[in-house]
């Protein structure tokens, strides 16, 4: 049975532990570029377990986290008990009009319905506010990372796929940051296990995929007998200003 796009977008709750253990955070340079200098109150839309939320809170910002998956928000609330965390979606944001300086969407814009989300984001932003989108994509120029992609699927490039932000947003800009995430072999397995494709696959397909990743870890010259891995990323950013 084929999962719908919506079902895939909501599947992460069943793998929340793997998601939290395996997914990377976001580089400071990307966050610097996405945020307007004067931002004080920021909405992390599609916050998940709080990978980006944590980085925003560390900057002393007043952050509101919104996500449609209760299990993800439970993890976020446990880690950031002082942060407001609300159940909601990009199509129905549970905030007042003109209430935030920036809306950041990390690793989630590809799940939303832009026709419904754009008016909602514009509604909650203050005039001149910023919408920022960000994706961590594996840098598959490195041999073993390319082989990983052959097992679990290539990482899409949102810029290549022509993400657009229509009116009332203007001055759409794009930026990339190259960086390296350091993780354990088990965290790499968790990263794979937290992907929507893996979560929603039949059990035998999921098991085979994870076994192939373990085989790569055990046999690739750059990975075998290693307690730590360096996984290169290209973080893709898109930002636009509310007219």
UniProtKB/Swiss-Prot annotation:
E.C. code: 2.1.1.-
Keyword list, A-Z: Methyltransferase, Transferase
Domain of life: Bacteria
EC top class, as a word: transferase
Single GO MF descriptor: methyltransferase activity
Protein name: Uncharacterized methyltransferase Rv3342
Keyword Translocase tagged: no
């Amino acid at each position: 049975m084929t999962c719908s796009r919506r079902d895939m977008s909501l599947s992460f709750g069943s793998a929340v532990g793997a998601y939290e253990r395996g997914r990377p955070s976001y580089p400071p340079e990307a966050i610097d570029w996405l945020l307007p200098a004067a931002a004080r109150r920021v909405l992390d839309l599609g916050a998940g377990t709080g990978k980006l939320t944590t980085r925003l809170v560390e900057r002393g910002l007043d952050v509101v986290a919104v996500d449609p998956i209760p299990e993800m928000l439970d993890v976020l609330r446990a880690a950031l008990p002082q942060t407001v965390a609300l159940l909601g979606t990009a199509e129905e944001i549970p905030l007042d009009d003109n209430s935030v300086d920036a809306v950041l969407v990390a690793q989630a814009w590809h799940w939303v319905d832009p026709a419904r989300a754009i008016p909602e984001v514009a509604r909650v932003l203050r005039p001149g506010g910023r919408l920022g989108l960000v994706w961590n994509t594996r840098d598959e120029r490195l041999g073993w990372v390319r082989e990983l992609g052959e097992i679990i699927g290539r990482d899409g490039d949102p810029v290549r796929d022509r993400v657009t932000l229509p009116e009332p947003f203007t001055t759409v800009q794009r930026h990339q940051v190259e960086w390296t995430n350091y993780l354990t072999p088990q965290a790499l397995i968790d990263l794979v296990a937290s992907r929507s494709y893996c979560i929603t696959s039949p059990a035998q397909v999921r098991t085979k995929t994870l076994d192939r990743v373990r085989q790569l870890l055990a046999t690739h010259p750059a990975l075998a007998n290693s307690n730590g891995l360096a996984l290169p990323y290209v973080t893709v950013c898109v930002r636009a200003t509310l007219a």
